[in-house]
Amino acid sequence: MLFRSGVFYRVGNDDALNRRELGEQSLVLVASPQIADVDFTEPGRHNACSFIINEPQCVFRQIFESTLRQRRITVENTIELLSIESIKRCVAANIGVSYLPRFAVEKELESGELIELPFGEQSQTITAMCAHHAGKAVSPAMHTFIQCVEESFVAG
C-alpha cells in the first residue's frame, strides 16, 4: 500500500497539498556529554568538531548553517546521514554535534545520553505539518495515519 501523505516542515505554500499544521517545534543543538571546548554563541570561533545532519535541503540544517554564517562560526566538517536515528547515535558516540527538533531528541536529553548546548537566547522554531495531495481521495488507512500523527503531536 502506498501512502501519499507525510509530515514535513513548512517552507512555503503549495496549492496542490491539503495541509494541517501540527504546531511549532523548537530546535535544539545537541552533543554527547563528553564533547568539550565547543561554543556556538561566540562570533568568529572555530569549533573542532563535526556537524552531523541530513540533506542540504533540510530546513533545520539551513537555519543552523545560516546562523553560523551570520556569527562567522565554523566547524571541522559536515557529515550527512539519511536518518535522524543514525544522527543521534553518532552524536551520542561523540562524533560531533547536531541541530534537531527537540521532540526528536527528547528521550536522549532526559536520559542524559545527549546534552543541549547553548545556541542563542531564544530557541528557534519550525512549523511541523501533515499534508496530502489536494483533490485525491483519503483512504481509511491514510485517515487513521493522519489522526495518529495529529494525536501524537498534540500529546507531545
Language-model regions, residue ranges each:
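Hydrophobic residues within well-ordered alpha-helices
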Residues: 1, 46, 89-95, 130
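A late-sequence structural motif
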Residues: 117-156
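Short beta-strand->loop
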Residues: 18-23, 27-28, 111-124
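Secondary-structure junction motif
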Residues: 37-38, 49-71, 138-142, 146, ...
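Short helix-loop capping/hinge motifs at secondary-structure junctions, enriched
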Residues: 14, 34-42, 135-140
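Hydrophobic hinge/microswitch elements
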Residues: 65-117
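Beta->alpha turn/N-cap motifs
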Residues: 7-12, 32-33, 83, 100-104
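Short beta-strand-centered segments that line the small-molecule binding cleft or hinge
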Residues: 1-27, 31, 39-40, 92
